[in-house]
Amino acid sequence: MKKLFMLLMVLALAATPLAANAEDAVLNRIENGASGDFDGDGTTETVAFATQRDEYDDGGFTLTVGGTTVSKENCIALSEELYAVSVPYDAYYAENDLMGTLFMAFEYGPSDDPVSYCYFYTDGALYDAGTIEALPTAMQFFGREIRTTLRSDLLGTWSRPATFVLGYGYSMEGDEYKSDYRLAEVPQDVYAMGLISKTKVELPLQVSRTDDASAGTIPAGAKLTFAATDNLHWVYAESMDGEIRGWFYVDSSDYPTMVRVNGTMTSADEVFDNLMYAD
């Protein structure tokens, strides 16, 4: 109720040392037992962070901020480090005043496939905000936005930029207001891809994703560059001499990835040679 009233009345919280400008939010490593005002309410909260790991560093962790505790099990190559970044209110409400603090524990994963577990502390409570498949130290923070680089496995392994936003909302449950906080990815229209492969069959290309007019055909046995993709269904390809360029359709919703060739969905391994995937 306090937060809803604050938003409706456009009141500001007292500024704290943890508050940061949207342009220069700083990621900090948090030690077990650290204390501070992590939600801008004028009181001090203590952080307790403990991991339980086996000889392979697999296991779980427990995070307590103030009087709220969360736990996570079944992590792979779990780190003992905890990071946090202050999240200010949007300027529309109260510029630079502290909305809360995003805490991040993380695992390195089975094959350098990191996952950060994100928890948002605000108004005296700790909320599960979701995950980001990147290390906290590989992220940049701009208010409620987080920018990083993610791994993609469409027609090979490559990296793409990603932006996440911390969403928030309120709902009435009985006589009380419930708060919700969750990270969601902001999709891009297309991403730079930059992989080179070789065709096993002729590959027709079309002019655009919405115009199926022919843009030419890559011959069988020819090399081509996957230049861009929406990371869902469309890949923009170009012949090595740059004379033929256009789009083709893929479906990666299941294994194996399928490529549309002359109206027929065909396994990507039957269409392309030398697709490079990391383990």
What feature does the model see in each segment?
Residues 1-7:
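Positively charged n-region of N-terminal signal peptides that target proteins for export
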Residues 14-26:
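Sec-dependent signal peptide cleavage junction
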Residues 23-25, 68-82, 130-132:
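Blade-edge motifs of beta-propeller repeat domains
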Residues 29-33, 87-89:
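Signature of short aromatic-glycine-proline-rich micro-motifs recurring in repeat-based ectodomains
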Residues 31, 56-63, 114-116, 159-161:
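Repetitive beta-architecture junctions, highlighting loop-to-beta-strand starts
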Residues 36-47, 55, 93-104:
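Acidic, glycine-anchored loop motifs typical of Ca2+
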Residues 83-121, 125-196:
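Short aromatic loop motif centered on NTY/YTY
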Residues 186-245, 257-279:
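Beta-loop motif signature
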